[in-house]
Structure formats: C-alpha cells, structure tokens
C-alpha cells in the first residue's frame, strides 16, 4: 500500500489527491474528514503528470460499520489517502439472502449482491443497447432467483429464453406456450386479440354486441367454439343487414335484449369483421384454448411465456391479460386470507370460496411473484396506452403492497413510458451510447448522477452501472457471464458461413 495525499481545497462531496504510483479510474479510496472519520470515495477522473498522478474523487459517504452514512464535513486537507481494502467493500456489498450477480469492475475479489426483497418488491429495469449484455444479465438474475425458489414469470417475445438452462436451475424452468381462453377476456380485449384497431369503432361495437350475446346464450362455450359462435352470429346479422331488418343483442347492463336496425352499409362492416375473425382463427388457432394461462404458472419456478410467432397486437393482449389477472388474483387471495376470519358469515363464505378456487387453480398467487418483461418498450410504449401498459403500470404503482414485482428489460429506453420506468427503483444500466437515451434514463433515476451518466457510453459488454434500492451504493459492476445456456447470444455468422463445407 502506498501513500497518497489530499491536495488543494476540499468539500463534503469532492476532493483531489496526488500519488507517485499509478492510480485507476473507478477505484475506491478512503480519506479522513475534519471530524477524523473515514470517508469512502471513488476516483472519477485521473490526470497523469511527468512525476505524479492526480485523482479527482467523488465522496460516497462516511464508513459506519458495514453501512455508508452521509458525510457532513469537508475532507481534511493534506491528509493521507489510501486504497479501500477488499474486506471493507465486501462487507458493504454483502446482503443477507442477496443475489450474487457479479463483481466490482475495479475489484475482481469484491462480489456484488442485490437485495432480493428490494429488487422484487420495488421493481427494477435492465437497460442496454443491443448486444450490451441485457439477456445475460436477466439470465444471471433468473439463476440467482431460482436458487431461492423464486416464482418468476418471464415474458419472452422472441423465444430467447426457451432454452434457458443451468445446473442450479434443474427442474425449476417451465416453458409455457401462450394459450388463452377468449371467454375470460373483456370485449375490448377480445377485439384487440383478433386484430381490430382502436379506430375501427363500428367493428368494435359489433364485436361487443356479439360477444355479450354469445356469452349469455351459450354459457358453456369456451376456446375456439366460443369464437366460432361469435363468427356464426355475425354471419346471421350480415344476412339481416342485407335486407335492412333489426337484430337482437344482449345488453349485460340491462340484463335484457336490445334491438338495432341494420342498414346495407352494416353488411360491409360485418363481412369485413367476419373475414378478420376467419384470418385470426387460421393464424392463431393453436393459441386459443379452454384453460386460463394463469393456471399453468408454478410456484418456485422460472415460468417462461414464449410469445414468439405472435404479432404485436396479440402479444400486447396476452401480456395485459397476464398482468391484470396476476395482480387481481393476488389481491383477492390476500384479502380473502383476512376475510375468512370476518364476523360476517357471508363474507367468510365468499372468502373461503375464493381461497378454495385459488388453491385449486391459481396456486401461483399464493406466493409473491416477479413478472419480468423482455422487450418492455413493446408493451409500455411512451405515447400509447394499451391493456398491457395499463396493467403493468398498475403493478409498478401498486404491486409492492401485494407482493407482485416487475422487471423491465429493454434496449430502447426512450421508448418506455416514463411513468412506469420511474417506478423501477433499481436500474441495471449496461452500455448506453445515445445521449438522448442517457438523459431519458437519468430523468427516471433519482440516484443516477451526471458522473455515472458519463460512464455509460464507455462501458464494455457485460459491464453495468447499478443504482437504486437493491444495491448498497451506486456502482459499476462486471456482471457474471451466465455459464449455462440461453438464446440471447449473437450468432457467429462467419463461423456458420465457414461451416458450409460440412454440408
């Protein structure tokens, strides 16, 4: 260990020191404040002179056992500066029941842990350019969560994680194909599912009429049968429209039938709607079933929902459905646990019925659950509201109270809705080059200072700035390389070209 000295004026937040030995950007050092207490700082800039090195240090805080507390007094001028021992840093970053995700960029021997409770309950985001290491980071997190019997639902739009495997995750991965029962959707969600745009008002009106009518008249219809009955009813209405007669449709608010006179113009609308449904059935028949996809999720597993092969409207509908019913069923479960002890007999009866249904069909919501959304910008776009953004937003705002966590993964940060992004209290930010992306992330991150923003463009693959509730202090971390199997790696193009000789 060598001697380094504070030079020039000091403050409570910054100081400068000189060293005759080489020093590195990002190193952790300790100096005394004027109260004689040890203060931890990180070197944010290094200038080399002919005879010495000059380091500019940002103060992190006063060392108080294994904690960091705010520094209230300036650094002692002309005092000694020393490198922080690995042991001190290890004690700071060690978190009971934490997730072991990597090491400090400047210290291979200092492991970095994320507080599991704070990461899940207060939500997180993994942000990066394409190829920056976000899929590797998500895989490492899933490995660590699996070690703790975590219940995770991973939304996988491109099938990157369906091959996910690690020996520590043996028996803890379940791949789920997106199958939905249309009876469980609201009419507007059903319209979205079959590809009716928000601006196609007339079509959406007839979808709602037909949906309520079939649900009332055919209460046992499910899956593809339910859709076909809607299609048949619309066909009957198209014949009525061609002659200008009235149709009868069920109104659930009045619990009775209403009538509507059709014009010949309605014939064109209805036939177009029938064509849309027919095309949907042709493309997505395998994604329609008579079970609730929430029933497929298992406690203590990484449940991977493989959305590859779906178009964006169908993806959004699936994700909105999952987010909505996870949150609502979890709320129902927790409320019923209390209501079952109510002095009111009817409240007790309803609560016990809810608990029986949940224990039989939706056991996943009996434990806290983490919903990780890959390609999150698809589902929470900055200038658009959809069913997915509505319910993911509710989880971001209210999920902490009910044990439903949210993780967002995206390579397009500025396309994420700022209200939802700002609710993620821990940010794992890998390489970000575009200044607009950097500023956008900074606006959504209270702890991301200007000094850390400047570091984002210079990060290597797998290196991340981590800030927020789940980490002891803002840090630059080298994320572990996931030593199992996952599908997010770049294709070795030249290797495959050169392998043509093997064919």
From Swiss-Prot:
<dbReference type="InterPro" id="IPR002789">
    <property type="entry name" value="HerA_central"/>
</dbReference>
<keyword id="KW-0067">ATP-binding</keyword>
<dbReference type="GO" id="GO:0004386">
    <property type="term" value="F:helicase activity"/>
</dbReference>
<dbReference type="GO" id="GO:0016887">
    <property type="term" value="F:ATP hydrolysis activity"/>
</dbReference>
<keyword id="KW-0413">Isomerase</keyword>
<feature type="binding site">
    <location>
        <position position="122"/>
    </location>
    <ligand>
        <name>ATP</name>
    </ligand>
</feature>
<keyword id="KW-0347">Helicase</keyword>
<dbReference type="InterPro" id="IPR008571">
    <property type="entry name" value="HerA-like"/>
</dbReference>
<keyword id="KW-0238">DNA-binding</keyword>
<comment type="function">
    <text>Involved in DNA double-strand break (DSB) repair. Probably acts with NurA to stimulate resection of the 5' strand and produce the long 3' single-strand that is required for RadA loading. Has DNA-dependent ATPase activity and DNA helicase activity.</text>
</comment>
<dbReference type="Pfam" id="PF01935">
    <property type="entry name" value="DUF87"/>
</dbReference>
<keyword id="KW-0234">DNA repair</keyword>
<dbReference type="Pfam" id="PF09378">
    <property type="entry name" value="HAS-barrel"/>
</dbReference>
<keyword id="KW-0378">Hydrolase</keyword>
<dbReference type="GO" id="GO:0005524">
    <property type="term" value="F:ATP binding"/>
</dbReference>
<keyword id="KW-0547">Nucleotide-binding</keyword>
<keyword id="KW-0227">DNA damage</keyword>
<feature type="binding site">
    <location>
        <begin position="478"/>
        <end position="479"/>
    </location>
    <ligand>
        <name>ATP</name>
    </ligand>
</feature>
<dbReference type="InterPro" id="IPR018538">
    <property type="entry name" value="HerA_barrel_dom"/>
</dbReference>
<protein>
    <recommendedName>
        <fullName>Probable DNA double-strand break repair helicase HerA</fullName>
        <ecNumber>5.6.2.3</ecNumber>
        <ecNumber>5.6.2.4</ecNumber>
    </recommendedName>
</protein>
<feature type="binding site">
    <location>
        <begin position="131"/>
        <end position="136"/>
    </location>
    <ligand>
        <name>ATP</name>
    </ligand>
</feature>
<comment type="similarity">
    <text>Belongs to the HerA family.</text>
</comment>
<dbReference type="InterPro" id="IPR027417">
    <property type="entry name" value="P-loop_NTPase"/>
</dbReference>
């Amino acid at each position: 260990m060598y001697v380094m000295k504070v030079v020039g004026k000091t403050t409570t937040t910054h100081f400068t020191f000189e060293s005759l030995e080489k020093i590195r950007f990002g190193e952790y050092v300790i100096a005394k404040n004027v109260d004689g207490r040890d203060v931890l700082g990180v070197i944010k800039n290094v200038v080399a002179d002919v005879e010495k090195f000059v380091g500019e240090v940002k103060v992190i805080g006063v060392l108080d056992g294994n904690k960091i507390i705010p520094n209230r007094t300036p650094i002692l001028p002309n005092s000694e500066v020393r490198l922080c021992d690995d042991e001190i840093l290890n004690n700071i970053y060690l978190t009971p029941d934490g997730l072991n995700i990597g090491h400090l960029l400047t210290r291979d021997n200092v492991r970095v842990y994320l507080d599991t409770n704070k990461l899940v309950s207060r939500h997180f985001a993994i942000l990066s350019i394409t190829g920056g290491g976000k899929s590797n980071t998500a895989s490492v997190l899933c490995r660590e969560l699996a070690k703790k019997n975590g219940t995770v639902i991973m939304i996988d739009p491109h099938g990157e994680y369906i091959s996910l495997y690690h020996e520590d995750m043996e028996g803890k991965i379940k791949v789920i194909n997106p199958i939905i029962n249309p009876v469980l959707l609201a009419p507007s969600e059903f319209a979205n599912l079959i590809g009716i745009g928000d601006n196609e008002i007339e079509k959406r009106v007839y979808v709602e009429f037909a949906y309520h009518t079939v649900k009332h008249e055919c209460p046992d219809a499910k899956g593809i049968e339910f859709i076909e009955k809607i299609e048949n009813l619309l066909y009957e209405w198209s014949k009525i429209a061609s002659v200008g007669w009235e149709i009868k449709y069920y109104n659930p608010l009045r619990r009775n039938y209403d009538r509507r006179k059709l014009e010949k113009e309605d014939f064109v609308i209805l036939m177009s709607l029938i064509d849309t449904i027919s095309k949907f059935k042709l493309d997505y028949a395998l994604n329609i079933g008579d079970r609730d996809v929430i029933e497929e999720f298992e406690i203590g597993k990484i449940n991977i929902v493989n959305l590859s092969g779906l178009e964006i409207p169908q993806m959004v509908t699936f994700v909105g459905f999952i987010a909505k019913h996870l949150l609502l069923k979890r709320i129902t479960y927790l409320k019923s646990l209390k209501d079952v002890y109510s002095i009111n007999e009817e409240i007790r009866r309803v609560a016990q019925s809810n608990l029986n249904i949940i224990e039989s069909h939706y056991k996943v919501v009996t434990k806290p659950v983490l919903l990780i959304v890959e390609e999150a910008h698809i589902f929470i776009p900055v200038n658009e509201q959809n069913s997915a953004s509505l319910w993911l937003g509710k989880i971001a705002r209210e999920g902490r109270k009910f044990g439903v966590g949210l993780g967002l993964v995206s390579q397009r940060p500025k396309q994420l809705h700022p209200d939802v992004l700002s609710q993620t209290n821990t940010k794992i930010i890998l390489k970000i080059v575009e200044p607009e992306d950097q500023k956008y992330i900074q606006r959504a991150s209270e702890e991301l200072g200007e000094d850390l923003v400047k570091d984002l463009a210079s990060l290597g693959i797998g290196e991340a700035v981590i800030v927020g509730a789940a980490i002891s202090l803002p840090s630059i971390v080298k994320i572990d390389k996931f030593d199992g199997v996952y599908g997010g790696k770049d294709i070795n193009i030249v290797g495959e070209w050169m392998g043509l000789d093997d064919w």
